[in-house]
Regions:
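Phosphate-binding loop of NTP-binding sites
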Residues: 3, 22, 62-68, 77-224, ...
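Short internal beta-strands
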Residues: 26-34, 222-224, 356-357, 376-385
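Beta-strand->loop->alpha-helix junctions that form or flank phosphate-binding loops
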Residues: 31, 53-56, 97-102, 142-143, ...
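Short beta-strand "acidic-cap" motif of Rossmann-like dinucleotide-binding folds
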Residues: 27-31, 140-141, 168, 241, ...
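C-terminal helical cap/extension that packs against the catalytic core
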Residues: 41-48, 367-426
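N-terminal leader/targeting and accessory segments in enzymes
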Residues: 1-98, 102, 300, 457
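Residue-level signal for inorganic ion chemistry
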Residues: 20, 73, 115, 144, ...
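Nucleotide phosphate-binding/pyrophosphate-handling subdomain across enzymes
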Residues: 3, 15-23, 272-378
Length: 460
């Protein structure tokens, strides 16, 4: 019997294994590590009848015993699409797919809304899911938001569950490049700035991956306020564009904009006040317009959209308001894993700002972020493995505020609070501008740690 080989015991690998097993496939999971966590996960899958092999590195030799029977190899988003082992498998005629492709196969009879972009996609995903759900639609979200797309596919196999009206799927560039068969009914592109270049090699390659998803969508919704997308408007003659910039109308076939009186408008007139979404920042106004355009396309009335926007509680780790401490507003923006996302946060919160930044640095243009440090930040506290890289950038920029550096975020938070009090900061902001993998499992774990620390300090 042909088998499906699943690479890795991460969230996506486990989800793909369980879904394919439920569909009747013979499944074998291969995992490199053999630690206690992997042992526990492996046993859970074995208890479900899924063969799991530990100590299998991502090398061609790990796959050879199954080559005659393999139907497909399913990889997690963290594995580069051009990994030498995957290329060798393809040379032997093996189909290599991402977990998202497995989910699409299970869920393609439901209309998808595919959401991508360098920054903003998680907020748009959560907000659109909320708006559609508040309007009475069954619109589960999954993908790059902490819930495996394959696990959603497995849930939807349950005959006791109603079929989704819409699937709201956040899709990273990693997930898109390994699932080119996905064709959303609605595609949303939030922003494009340099990110993941160490993986994709160039900005053009990164852009082309995201562009592919929108080209395969029946309806494309794009952000006219993004410089990169705006510069390529000729590529999208049939797209729906949105803009929060009141002077940005002429070059675009704008579907939605904000008028000088502060109302969201389309060609029929004003729909509702733009302040229906309480989240701070111009970027969140853009997110709100993208969600509104998609919700209108999905058949919602403006009144229903406004109700959903007004009741939205926000997104963890995205400018998450943690209250106040020593007279400072405290914000958890752990999701800001690059300079552009961190720059957005620096523009959104009240200044002067006591900033916490650091982690595992990424390639990218730091100039805009550095300028905002000069303009809005009274003190900077760095942490993590690449704190000295950031320190060098900050010093070279001529920044004159206080800068301190600590190995761990635990020590950094204590120092940042002291620096913020000293500098009369209005906001204490965790916006790392770096990935989290040097010290944390993911940005959620980093943000949860920060939130826990602030809550403990608030109780003292």
């Amino acid at each position: 019997m042909a088998c499906s080989l699943i690479v890795g015991l991460g969230r996506s690998g486990v989800g793909a294994a369980r879904l394919l097993h439920a569909q009747g496939h013979q499944v074998v999971v291969l995992e490199r590590d053999e630690g206690p966590e992997q042992q526990s996960k492996a046993q859970q899958l074995r208890d479900q009848g899924i063969q799991t092999e530990l100590g299998c590195p991502l090398e061609f030799s790990s796959f050879q015993r199954w080559l005659d029977d393999v139907e497909q190899v399913v990889i997690s988003p963290g594995i580069p699409w051009d990994h030498p082992t995957l290329m060798e498998l393809r040379d032997h005629g093996v189909t290599v797919r991402g977990e998202m492709a497995v989910a699409w196969q299970a869920l393609s009879d439901c209309p998808w809304i595919g959401i991508t972009g360098t920054n903003g996609k998680t907020t748009v995903t959560h907000l659109l899911h909320h708006v559609l759900s508040q309007a009475g639609l069954h619109a589960p979200m999954a993908g790059n938001v902490g819930h495996s797309a394959a696990e959603l596919g497995l849930q939807c196999m349950d005959p006791a569950r109603s079929k989704p009206d819409w699937i709201v799927m956040e899709m990273s560039s990693y997930q898109i490049e390994s699932a080119k068969e996905i064709r959303p009914t609605i595609g949303i592109w939030t922003t494009l700035t340099p990110d993941h270049l160490e993986r994709h090699g160039s900005m053009d390659a990164y852009r082309d991956i995201k562009k592919g998803l929108l080209q395969r969508s029946d309806h494309a919704v794009l952000n006219a306020d993004d410089a990169d997308l705006k510069s390529r408007q000729a590529h999208w003659p049939d797209a729906q564009w949105v803009s929060s910039a009141q002077t940005n109308h002429e070059p675009f076939n704008l579907e939605l904009w904000v008028n000088p009186e502060g109302f969201v408008c389309n060609k029929k007139g004003a729909l509702f006040p733009a302040n229906a979404l309480a989240m701070p920042g111009e970027h969140n106004r853009q997110n709100m317009l993208l969600v509104t355009a998609a919700a209108l396309q999905a058949g919602l009335e403006p009144q229903a959209i406004e109700r959903g926007l007004r009741s939205f509680p926000g997104v963890p780790h995205r400018l998450e308001n943690l209250g106040s401490l020593h007279g400072m507003h405290v914000f958890n923006d752990s999701k800001a894993t690059n300079y552009d996302a961190a720059a957005v946060a620096l523009q959104a919160v009240p200044g002067p700002i006591a900033l916490l930044a650091g982690g595992l640095s990424k390639q990218g243009d730091a100039s805009g972020w550095l300028q905002l440090l000069h303009d809005r930040v009274c003190s900077i506290t760095l942490f993590g493995s690449d704190r000295n890289i950031l320190l060098g950038l900050i010093r070279d920029s001529g920044y004159t505020g206080d800068v301190t550096s600590h190995p761990s975020m635990t020590d950094a938070v204590t120092a940042a609070i002291a620096q913020g009090k000293k500098g009369n900061a209005s906001s204490l902001l965790l916006s790392p501008a770096c990935a989290s993998f040097d010290q944390y499992k993911d940005f959620e774990a980093r943000g949860n740690h920060f939130r826990d620390m602030i809550q403990q300090l608030s109780r003292k």
